[in-house]
């Protein structure tokens, strides 16, 4: 499941347990919400255990949104997920910002957009 809210001028998208949600569907949901709220920066929040399918969906959503020039960040306490996200984003040319904490991600996105 994907929930969203606006916090301090930042679109915060929270990915929760979504058994059966396909990677492409999640990528489409994330990218559609980012496009609808363009030019608002976005933070995708992931949990402590992040399945590979969710990582792939976030990277795919980021790829879909690159042309719009919207700042997209990811926040997850999972160090392995952060490393994987950074490596996959770097392979696509970089630009995806990855944080360990949600509050840091939101503050940084807000400050960068200002």
Give, region by region, the residue ranges found by the protein language model:
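STAS-like cytosolic regulatory interaction modules
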Residues: 1-50, 60, 64-114
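Internal alpha/beta domain cores that form substrate/cofactor-binding pockets in large enzymes
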Residues: 57
């Amino acid at each position: 499941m994907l929930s969203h809210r606006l916090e301090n001028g930042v679109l915060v998208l929270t990915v929760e347990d979504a058994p059966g949600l396909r990677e492409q569907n999640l990528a489409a949901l994330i990218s559609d919400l980012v496009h609808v709220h363009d030019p608002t920066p976005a933070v995708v929040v992931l949990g402590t255990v992040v399945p590979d399918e969710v990582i792939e969906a976030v990277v795919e959503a980021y790829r879909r949104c690159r042309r719009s020039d919207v700042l997209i960040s990811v926040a997850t306490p999972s160090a392995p997920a952060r490393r994987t996200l950074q490596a996959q984003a770097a392979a696509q040319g970089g630009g995806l910002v990855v944080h360990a904490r949600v509050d840091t991600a939101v503050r940084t996105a807000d400050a960068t957009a200002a």
